[in-house]
């Protein structure tokens, strides 16, 4: 007679083994109708699964994150059901969930078109609206293999042969005539799977191996109700408008090409933004008492073996050879900074030493993962390493946290998710060292009153880290900043200082990045601002234009005055109507447009408009120069009189 303990601590006793759904029915009809699955003793189980012994139970509904993930997984099966009806010869591979949705890899002898995708989606909805029950059956390994051999599913047979023990009892989920194999759980009825959208088709190698056959991957999104789906699709439309790749091309910021995959060709305007970010961070480095250094681009393999990178990071490192020596192009800056620290004797009185670098790094990321500025192979880190004593850890980490929030707020990012990533399976250093490192970061977070999420096993191989993820205007998270403790690397590279008792001790090293990759950060703010950069970051801060040729000399004088004031200003003297010029520069997102007609010349002024169409009236050139200089100096996010 199992006793079921519910989340509120109440208990229900049954005189026979009972399913998750039966417990929900015992609680109430409304809950039973909403039940998707259950969490039995912390493990997700299907609604039909039977509980035979005392257990804790949490009912999962569509309102739960787990429930939504199960809906998405079942929509992948629904996709399989529909495509199998429309294309009986298709071979089904895998259909997992991903963030916000799902996909299914299929093997079909022709390429799927948009018309095909529309037809599959239509059939999915028709099937879901029949509200059929999903039936789960446990079978032997051989029964599962016989089932898929009979159905002509070689990929399912390969999964059984290569990934599932012969003694296992796989779960087969029956969707009417369609059968799929999965760990589950899945929805008990397809009434839960009626709010979805198929999005695109892409190529994907079986098992992710380029030596295997290329399959077609059908992506979709699924939600608990119509409103959630509509809101998500609206966010996608807005994200597409803000895509940094499109905006980057429209504003002539940068380009990338096949001959240098994952490497950025910065154009003048994009490089202007890049340098402004560097200048801004440099002001903060001075404020927080950092020294700036520059390490070499590549170093001998021997050094990377000492650090552990060669053993733990080799797949992501570019290497080269010269004069019978093997070198690695640096994927990170920390080993070089330790070499700088090691030059000359250091005393405890010298610590902390805060060493910063805009370090050019390269990582051999898989080509399929590259994505505009967001995922590149060559990037610049606003990197720093702090060498300190154990007693200084909390104060130094606290200073890093303050600096992170200080910098992010300048860009308008105030919604920041904080995560503490702990020891991974593949790591260097002792458990005792990791205990101290993780406790040190947790103490600093507690001292600063920050709530945080623990990410088990997500730390780097040499230390735990705090991650700062920015939430943008579309609710997306971008992981940028990190503060990472490292008790291992300084010792591996023989870094020491003279302690107060004249003994030699190894310093603690704190890895710190705020923007992370500057390239990626530019991609993030391009999408956050939709290309409408604040005046201090805008490549061109103002354009001065004439109405007729008679104002050309005056325009040139205005441009010179503003340029001499340190502002980025251009003249537009083309023989075009002023309305045409304004429209063009508005599309280029230039913050201010200054129009000079005969009236403005007579008054010694300029007529000022913003890129959002606001007419600000007329100003003397000196007045406008002072206004814009103040906006740049204070790094304001809004333009003059902008809501």
UniProtKB/Swiss-Prot annotation:
It is found in: Cytoplasm. Gene3D superfamilies: 3.10.20.30, 3.30.54.20, Anticodon-binding domain (3.40.50.800), Bira Bifunctional Protein, Domain 2 (3.30.930.10), Threonyl-trna Synthetase, Chain A, domain 2 (3.30.980.10). Transmembrane segments: none annotated. GO terms for cellular component: cytosol. Its cofactor is Zn(2+). SUPFAM superfamilies: Class II aaRS ABD-related, Class II aaRS and biotin synthetases, TGS-like, ThrRS/AlaRS common domain. It catalyses: tRNA(Thr) + L-threonine + ATP = L-threonyl-tRNA(Thr) + AMP + diphosphate + H(+). Zn(2+) binds at residues 334, 385, 511. It is an enzyme of class 6 (ligase). Residues 1-61 form the TGS domain. Keywords: Aminoacyl-tRNA synthetase, ATP-binding, Cytoplasm, Ligase, Metal-binding, Nucleotide-binding, Protein biosynthesis, RNA-binding, tRNA-binding, Zinc. Homodimer. Catalyzes the attachment of threonine to tRNA(Thr) in a two-step reaction: L-threonine is first activated by ATP to form Thr-AMP and then transferred to the acceptor end of tRNA(Thr). Also edits incorrectly charged L-seryl-tRNA(Thr). This is Threonine--tRNA ligase. It comes from Haemophilus influenzae (strain PittEE). The gene is thrS.
């Amino acid at each position: 007679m199992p006793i079921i303990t519910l989340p509120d601590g109440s208990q229900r006793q049954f005189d026979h083994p009972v399913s998750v759904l039966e417990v929900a029915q015992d609680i109430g009809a409304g809950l039973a109708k909403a039940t998707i699955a259950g969490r039995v003793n912390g493990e997700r189980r299907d609604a039909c699964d039977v509980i035979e012994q005392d257990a804790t139970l949490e009912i999962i509904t569509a309102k739960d994150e787990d429930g939504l993930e199960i809906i998405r997984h079942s929509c992948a099966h629904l996709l399989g059901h529909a495509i199998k009806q429309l294309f009986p010869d298709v071979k089904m591979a895998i259909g997992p969930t991903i963030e916000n949705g799902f996909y299914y890899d299929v093997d079909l002898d022709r390429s799927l078109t948009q018309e095909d995708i529309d037809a599959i989606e239509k059939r999915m909805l028709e099937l879901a609206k029949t509200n059929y029950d999903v039936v789960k059956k446990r079978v032997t390994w051989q029964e599962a293999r016989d089932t898929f051999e009979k159905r002509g599913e070689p990929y399912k047979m390969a999964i059984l042969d290569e990934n599932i023990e012969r003694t296992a009892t796989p779960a087969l989920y029956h969707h009417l005539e369609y059968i799929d194999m999965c760990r589950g759980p899945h929805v008990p009825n397809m009434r839960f799977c009626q709010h979805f959208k198929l999005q695109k088709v892409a190529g994907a190698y079986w098992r992710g191996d380029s030596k295997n056959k290329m399959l077609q991957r059908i992506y979709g999104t699924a939600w608990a109700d119509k409103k959630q789906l509509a809101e998500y699709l609206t966010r996608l439309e807005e994200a597409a408008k803000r895509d940094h790749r499109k905006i980057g091309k429209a504003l002539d910021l940068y380009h990338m090409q096949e001959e240098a995959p994952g490497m950025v060709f910065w154009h003048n305007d994009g490089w202007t933004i890049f340098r402004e970010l560097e200048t801004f961070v440099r002001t903060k480095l001075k404020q927080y008492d950092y020294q700036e250094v520059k390490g070499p681009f590549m170093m001998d393999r021997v050094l990377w073996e000492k650090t552990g990178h060669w053993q733990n990071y080799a797949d992501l490192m570019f290497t080269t050879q010269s004069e019978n020596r093997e070198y690695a192009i640096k994927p990170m800056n920390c080993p070089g900074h330790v070499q700088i620290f090691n030059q000359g004797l250091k005393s405890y009185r010298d610590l902390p030493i805060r060493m910063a670098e805009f370090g050019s790094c390269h990582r051999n990321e898989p080509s399929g993962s590259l994505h505009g500025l967001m995922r590149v192979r060559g990037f610049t880190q606003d990197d720093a390493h702090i060498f300190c004593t154990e007693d200084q850890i909390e104060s130094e980490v606290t200073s890093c946290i303050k600096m992170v929030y200080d910098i992010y707020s300048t860009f308008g990012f105030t919604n920041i998710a904080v995560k503490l990533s702990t020891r991974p399976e593949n790591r260097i250093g002792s458990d005792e060292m990791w205990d101290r490192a993780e406790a040190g970061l947790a103490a600093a977070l507690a001292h600063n009153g920050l709530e945080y999420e623990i990410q088990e096993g997500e730390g780097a191989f040499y230390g735990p880290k705090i991650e700062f993820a920015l939430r943008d205007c579309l609710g997306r998270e971008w992981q940028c900043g990190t503060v990472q403790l490292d008790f291992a690397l300084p010792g591996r590279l023989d870094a020491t200082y003279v302690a107060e008792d004249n003994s030699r001790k190894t310093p603690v090293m704190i890895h710190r990045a705020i923007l992370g990759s500057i390239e990626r950060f530019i991609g993030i703010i391009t999408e956050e601002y939709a290309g409408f950069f604040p005046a201090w970051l805008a490549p061109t801060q103002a354009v001065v234009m004439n109405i007729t040729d008679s104002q050309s000399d005056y325009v040139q004088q205005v441009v010179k005055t503003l340029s001499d004031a340190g502002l980025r200003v251009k003249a537009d003297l083309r023989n075009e109507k002023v309305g045409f010029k304004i429209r063009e520069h508005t599309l280029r997102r230039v913050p201010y447009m200054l129009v000079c007609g005969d009236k403005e010349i007579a008054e010694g002024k300029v007529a000022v408009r913003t890129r959002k169409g606001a007419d600000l009236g007329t100003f003397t050139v000196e007045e406008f120069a002072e206004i814009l200089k103040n906006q740049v100096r204070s790094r304001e996010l809004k333009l003059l009189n902008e809501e």
